[in-house]
Amino acid sequence: MENLVEIKYNQTGQSKLINEYGMREMQARAFEKRNSQYLLVKAPPASGKSRALMFIGLDKLINQGLKKVIVAVPERSIGSSFKNTELKSYGFFADWRIDPRNNLTTAGGDSSKVNAFVRFMESDDEILVCTHSTLRFAYEKLDDKVFDNCLLAIDEFHHVSADTNS
């Protein structure tokens, strides 16, 4: 069968080169905006968006005075993108480290995930990964003020509903 559709992109390899901090071009561009209150990172699949969030989250914790980083993903399998990651060996100033009890994307009951989220918010722990669903249900149990001084990152933002009950 004849190939009816073929798309060729002008590939230079530039997007895979890393800078002195171990960042790809897109990650470095996102990191330049790390002082912004709101960020929307839009990039193709497998371009390093999760790692860009790690760089920004660590900077917010270490250099900008935020107390917590919460990453919400649409489904548990995506949570593995936020596992412990060595960044210092590539030139960054810190590694991404998440306590296993704060990775709420592993198998287990939903109510215990919500309780674990509440425990995280009451603790000195800094990084948590959960599903959108866990965030939504935990949010209902918490006062809005506990989210002050937190970076709340919504991965796969297009999955989020605008419904006020969601």
Model region roles, listed by residue range:
Residues 2-42:
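Conserved pre-motif I regulatory segment
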Residues 50-54, 60-61, 65-92, 97, ...:
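Conserved Walker A/P-loop ATP-binding site and its immediately adjacent core
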Residues 62-64, 119-122, 143-146:
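Conserved catalytic network of the ASCE P-loop NTPase/AAA+ motor domain
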Residues 67-68, 123-128, 148-151:
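Loop/turn-to-beta-strand initiation segments
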Residues 80, 137, 162:
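Alpha-helical elements of the RecA-like P-loop NTPase motor core of helicases
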Residues 91-139:
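Inter-Walker segment of RecA-like/P-loop motor cores
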